[in-house]
Regions:
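Acidic (Asp/Glu) carboxylate-rich active-site/surface patches
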Residues: 97-139, 149
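Residue-level signal for inorganic ion chemistry
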Residues: 29, 76, 101, 119, ...
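Conserved RNA-binding domains used in RNP assembly and mRNA/RNA metabolism
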Residues: 173, 218-265
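Short, acidic (Asp/Glu-rich) active-site segment that either coordinates a divalent metal cofactor
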Residues: 139-169
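Conserved, helical-rich catalytic subdomain that frames metal- and/or nucleotide-binding sites
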Residues: 172-228, 236
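N-terminal lobe of the biotin/lipoate ligase/transferase fold
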Residues: 1-107, 253
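Short beta-strand segments
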Residues: 51-53, 77, 115, 131-133, ...
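A generic structural motif
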Residues: 53-55, 121, 133, 223-225, ...
Length: 265
């Protein structure tokens, strides 16, 4: 089953609150949705999702480009208005988006993990990347747009990226993009609404634990690199603000914000 790509609004069956905008091609689904939020006469409804058959300038973390063969993968962005989330706690949004992708892919194969902060891996290979863009309103998150690219049916990757993999390469089967999108949106919606109702913070704590359990290279010593060079360390923790905590061979704890440390793959 393939998408019929047109620039129009539809809805996912049985989920009328999830409007879908399907595009044949765009430079970036994140940029398209952000422009829609900023310039449309009325802001798009929460959960509005833009999906493209092809992106000409898809971006991931660290400014990396995202290679995707037209029509072979799942490329989309969705919008949330999580004004109930304090800016200092915004990492929880990255956690629930990452978990929703991971758990949807878990239904198709084993070995799926989350590479901090939010890449999705199958063993040592990258199957999904995302770019989450937040807009602040005072000390709250006024808008969150996660942009996600999942490698589904592409079997040849020509970019210099070191370790891409698709679901088809893993299992040998073709996959239906609307089915996987629907599954992701349902999972994200469940997490998001539970977070909205989380008055005592217990749900956020449970999410942090689930996220930690799902992390790539959760056990053992592994190579990393920071501004001072390469070193071996084990994963110790991820703090509520998203800081990555490693324990090196000497037992010293090292804390990093995003882009301050890299995995050596």
């Amino acid at each position: 089953m393939n998408f019929t790509y047109k620039t129009k609004m539809t809805t996912i069956p049985e989920q009328p609150s999830f409007p879908i905008i399907r595009l044949e091609e765009t430079d970036s689904t994140n940029r398209y949705l952000s422009d829609l939020c900023d310039n449309a006469p009325a802001a798009p409804a929460e959960n509005t999702t833009v999906i493209a058959r092809f992106q000409t300038s898809g971006k991931g973390q660290r400014g990396n480009s995202w290679e995707s063969e037209a029509g072979q993968n799942l490329l989309f962005s969705t919008v949330l208005y999580p004004r109930f989330v304090e800016a200092r706690r915004q990492f929880v949004l990255s956690q629930i988006v990452s978990l929703a992708v991971k758990e949807e892919l878990d239904t198709y194969t084993e070995g799926i993990t989350i590479k901090w902060p939010n890449d999705i891996y199958w063993h040592e290979k990258k199957i999904c990347g995302m770019l989450i863009e937040n807009v602040l309103e005072g000390n709250r998150i006024g808008r969150c747009i996660p942009g996600i690219g999942i490698n589904l049916n592409q079997t040849v990757f020509r970019s210099p990226a070191p370790n891409p993999v698709s679901l088809k390469q893993i299992t040998g089967r073709d996959y239906d993009a609307p089915t996987i999108l629907n599954g992701f949106l349902r999972r994200l919606h469940t997490y998001y609404e539970a977070l909205r109702r989380d008055e005592d913070g217990r749900f956020a704590i449970s999410i942090a634990r689930r996220y930690a359990d799902a992390l790539f290279r959760r056990e053992g010593l592994h190579p990393y690199e920071d501004a001072n060079g390469r070193f071996l360390a084990r994963l110790a923790d991820v703090e509520p603000d998203g800081r990555f905590v490693l324990q090196d061979e000497a037992g010293r704890l090292r804390k990093y914000l995003f882009k301050e440390v890299q995995y050596i793959l």
